Swiss-Prot record:
The lineage of its organism: Eukaryota, Viridiplantae, Streptophyta, Embryophyta, Tracheophyta. This is CASP-like protein 3A1. PANTHER family: CASP-LIKE PROTEIN 3A1, CASP-LIKE PROTEIN 4A4. It is a multi-pass membrane protein. It comes from the Eukaryota. Residues 1-49, 118-132, 204-214 are cytoplasmic. It is found in: Cell membrane. Pfam families: CASP_dom (PF04535). Disulfide bonds: none annotated. Belongs to the Casparian strip membrane proteins (CASP) family. The chain crosses the membrane at residues 50-70, 97-117, 133-153, 183-203. Keywords: Cell membrane, Glycoprotein, Membrane, Transmembrane, Transmembrane helix.
Amino acid sequence: MTNGQKIEVAVQLPESKVAATENNETMSGPLVVGGGVAKPFGRKADVMHVILRLLCTITSVTAVSFMVTAHQSSTVSIYGFMLPVRSKWSFSHSFEYLVGVSAAVAAHSLLQLLISMSRLLRKSPVIPSRSHAWLIFAGDQVFAYAMISAGAAASGVTNLNRTGIQHTALPNFCKPLNYFCNHVAVSIAFAFISCLLLAALAVQEVIWLSKSKY
């Protein structure tokens, strides 16, 4: 009898150890994904993040492209005199500011796009940790506000070019310089679209942070 009891205990100990191991795996399984990285978002959300980042890159590059090609020469009538006029984006500090901010946004978005696509292709979470989420959230916020200020400053100069100055002989410069003004207007429009896309990315990152506990 004593020998039989000893054999029973020897057999039961491994079973209880296996059961405890299974319980530990079951408890930790849903909380940890891929080596301790939390993944509150699914595959669709990761794909949406990459699409938004791609669109932001395209719109910011388009804003830069249209602005740097905005230049034209023509003539304008002031007090009956036909005077030659030449306009170029680099003549205005507001337009230079818009080009600088748009280029910075394009570089930031392209870098984040490459990182996100590499993670997506490896089937890893696009946002791997809270620290990474906070970092890109801060970057998106800063660039969104900078883009708003640049677009607003450029819009003021463009509006002055289109309306002229009241009570003076200064005309609507966009009539003889329509190519220049149209390029500037398109650039400003894409700058504001980039700002909206950055805001959408920031919202997605806030949702990620609210769902993540790690």
